[in-house]
Amino acid sequence: MEVEFMLLGKKRKLGRKIEEITVGEKLSMTEKIEDKDILLYLGLTDDANPLYIQHDYASQTPFEKPIVPSIMLTGIITSAISKYLPGPGSHILSQEIDFPKPVYHYATIEFLFEVIAVTRDEHTVVISVVGSNEKNETVIQGKVKVCPPHRLEEIHGKTLDNF
């Protein structure tokens, strides 16, 4: 049974159920980090860390120029899980993420996601993620434990009679 849900007046399909996910599945995606994305993030979170936007300050640090907030990179990961693997209806239960190298403004990051465990009795999947910059340096890596969408029962007409 394929279930759809409404989002802003548009029908959307739920992500894949646990029975449809197998170890070894991969997703690759590329993200270019633009100033507008960083400014939106900083405005939304009210984060005024000078390391993220002030060139004068950043030039006096070992980073030498402004860097992308680590949590913003984590947001790209959570968005990919919500949109693609397993997709809409998924819920992140835990994450272990490292940031071995900084990401600078205007960087292009290649993300590779891979399903490394499927535990049906716990209704969880574990997805590894690695992000690399243009120099093929790993800038983000980790594992995310996800609860894929649950199978929904059809809603019958009489169910809503009391509303």
Residue ranges: model-predicted function:
Residues 93-94, 128:
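Beta-strand segments within the central parallel beta-sheet cores of soluble alpha/beta enzyme folds
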Residues 2-23, 104-163:
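HotDog/MaoC-like acyl-thioester-processing domains
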Residues 2-90, 153-163:
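Hot-dog-fold acyl-thioester-processing enzymes
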Residues 28-32, 98, 145-147:
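Generic structural detector for well-ordered beta-strands
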